[in-house]
């Protein structure tokens, strides 16, 4: 009888029991992405950011939101020159956000045939989290401005490597 009751409850509320914790420890239903009113909710990204990454310097320039998108040009440089250039586009799709990124070599040839595609999983006043949905995409990518105006980028790559990057406004 207990087994039947448990199965019955789960069949009535299949998504009720599927919950994950976001960065603030709050639980939310994993079956639905957070709703976004406007791409302007990401206005805090706008500006030029720079900081160390390995032996080089990572620079990001974020353009103001316009036309349901916000976009960035990213460049990694070191003593030898430019390692790569990356384009990032975050677009409001329906009531959520989709991030697409692609890396390019020095001749501006894409390093991958298709861009990485990531979908919104969490958004706050000065933070946003995406999960990879395309083949070869990062598992997770988050951006956050902390209380000291540091731009925190956190990545979990497709193979599970964790990368932490902190940039300052320039």
Description of each model-found segment:
Residues 34-48, 89-92:
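N-terminal helix-cap/turn-to-beta initiation motif at the start of protein domains
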Residues 53-55, 136-138, 158-160:
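Glycine-centered tight beta-turn/hairpin loop motif at sheet-sheet or coil-to-beta transitions
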Residues 1-4:
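Positively charged n-region of N-terminal signal peptides that target proteins for export
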Residues 6-15:
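Bacterial N-terminal signal peptides
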Residues 18-40:
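Sec-dependent signal peptide cleavage junction
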Residues 52, 56-134:
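Central antiparallel beta-sheet cores of small beta-barrel/beta-sandwich binding domains
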Residues 27-31, 118-120, 145, 149-170:
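Edge beta-strand at a domain terminus
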Residues 58-60, 86, 139-141, 161-165:
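Short beta-strand segments
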């Amino acid at each position: 009888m207990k087994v039947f009751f448990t199965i019955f409850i789960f069949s009535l509320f299949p998504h009720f029991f599927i919950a994950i914790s976001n960065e603030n420890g709050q639980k939310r239903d994993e079956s639905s992405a957070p709703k976004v009113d406007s791409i302007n909710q990401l206005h805090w990204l706008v500006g030029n950011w720079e900081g160390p990454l390995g032996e080089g310097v990572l620079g990001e320039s974020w353009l103001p939101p316009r036309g349901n998108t916000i976009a960035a040009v990213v460049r990694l440089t070191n003593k030898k020159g430019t390692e790569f250039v990356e384009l990032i586009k975050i677009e409001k799709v329906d009531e959520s956000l989709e991030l697409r990124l692609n890396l390019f070599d020095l001749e501006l040839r894409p390093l991958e045939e298709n861009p990485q595609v990531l979908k919104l999983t969490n958004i706050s006043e000065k933070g946003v989290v995406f999960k990879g949905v395309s083949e070869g995409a990062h598992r997770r990518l988050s951006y956050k401005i902390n209380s000291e105006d540091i731009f925190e980028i956190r990545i979990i790559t497709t193979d599970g490597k964790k990368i932490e990057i902190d940039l300052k406004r320039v």
